[in-house]
């Protein structure tokens, strides 16, 4: 049945009546029933529907697999959305499989003649029973005579919470009921992530990755979680959390306005609230939403500020425990107190303690509830308790106190609570603040005076500096060993490019524009004109000239010369007739001009150029900005690596280096380089892996989004490879020009290159061997998937990012 649905959908892809035809087909293929009894089991091809027509129970499979599951899904919605699976760990494979109700009220799934693969357990019904699918989506086993519910699916949750279903705990019995993610989007067996609520007072929600906290909601305050600022006073909460006298707590979800809504815990650890709009699923909430949501990202006594990008800070009176770790963007060691507390209860002397209040805070973990009538009493109770480090009086909760490390704290742009932190009085010295204000005022005054004075000198010297600048550039270049480098005059380049006309413009990148030109001797050239706002300064400009002039290889672009005049900086290259690789791979028409054999030749050529840079040249070069737009193609479609402005040269036995100024292109940067500034041969290997998957798929890393969950290119490539469907990643424009084995091998090589740990990636020599031989390949480990922006927009083309030298790592796009 799934195959027929898929076939019909493809045939009616551009027809407005597709959904009607699909629905009509399902009437003839699927036999619907009102209930399951001992006399009437559920077989493959049959469904059990709820009376309101919203849900149905039936058999289903993924990608036309032989493995069949029994599950509940939304009726009439294509593609199928499964909200509960009975046999999530044991699929059936026999076409004679059926779901039956036994005489004792136990619901059992038989795999044909192979026995029972799943059971609801012993229900012990004495008068017979039946199975119904309620309008809420709850599958229930009911005793026929008494009407007593013997078993229900809402007490055995999967990865989805439906309206009226509950997450719960019981203090006395230790029972817990939560959500458990699927292993993958096509494997419903239990995955790595679990959602639970805690039995503390007040309760809070936890998203766990194994046994480790991954995300925390903050304590519950009557109608909202304090760690979710979206739940403000104007928010009509569809949630409730209640406790009964038996020590049980129930977290319930209701959506009165939409029968087709759900909350899902995805295989990659994201909680999504989804509502069906008649055509598609709208995401009304998704978390974790950013790095601040990850549990304990800023460590003890640190807090994460939600900004663009998020960053960690220490509370007033605290300093980073490890400055070096904070500089690299690793904040998990947290902060330590600068001035030791001397607890004297109500003392008013120099050793007295005071409170510093921080607004818009997600309350930290490890809180304790204290009975207080108001905020003033809450503060006094904390002051009288020497172990109390902070307090908060929260509407809907009351007084919370902290005597342990303040962990997993976030500061929102709006919303949140007031957190008061206990400090030594010296941290809030009034006189010290006054001195600071006076010093700032005097400094600003002097700055303004000096500014006006300097402005006068600047105006008289600006023309003089322009002339000096050109001589300085030329002198610097002459001190370098760059034989054969030609120095061009500006008027020569202006004539060659028709004064940099738009008709001569070949493209635009992060450092400026590239123009086609023709010299008087007939030579065709490409001119890279650095923009005045370019981040490529003197160092990068010199770097590119010196490096490229000393490198000679058929797969590297050749620089002919340069031109410096005033503020203008130009690089002159050999002209590449076919421009850059991205103009073919990502263009709907031109991609047809490069079939699979040609793409495979280009892949091997890039690898040879990379091997020359890393191993075979007299200089060892790390490119640091390898991407599709930096691969140029000559008239014979031979690839040439270009743009060496960010390249670094290694000497002797050096194999890696570290920088505090991280510059590169979003999506191509390896994890260790993006977040710690560490680069090596393996950084370029990671970029090559991304580039390889782009060439295979014809999809751009920064724009690709697959399926309802919006999977990235790396995530989709991993899913295809895990399912032995590597050929599914292939660009459809390639048709039958490829060999499936060769494509699958290249997908596996790409995944080996983008592994998280640099040590797991192949070196360049191993990479070229993998591409040119048929030797066995190692199995890749799951890569780190890049997360799309929350507004659904892709970054701009080849967006560059910079991590500046700060104690708080900040990322800027360019």
UniProtKB/Swiss-Prot annotation:
Coiled-coil residue spans: none
Entry keyword Kinase: yes
A Pfam family per the record: DUF3403
Record-annotated active site: 625 (proton acceptor)
InterPro entries: Bulb-type_lectin_dom (IPR001480), Bulb-type_lectin_dom_sf (IPR036426), Kinase-like_dom_sf (IPR011009), Pan_app (IPR003609), Prot_kinase_dom (IPR000719), Protein_kinase_ATP_BS (IPR017441), S-locus_recpt_kinase_C (IPR021820), S_locus_glycoprot_dom (IPR000858)
Record's keyword annotation contains tRNA-binding: no
Protein name per UniProt: G-type lectin S-receptor-like serine/threonine-protein kinase At1g61400
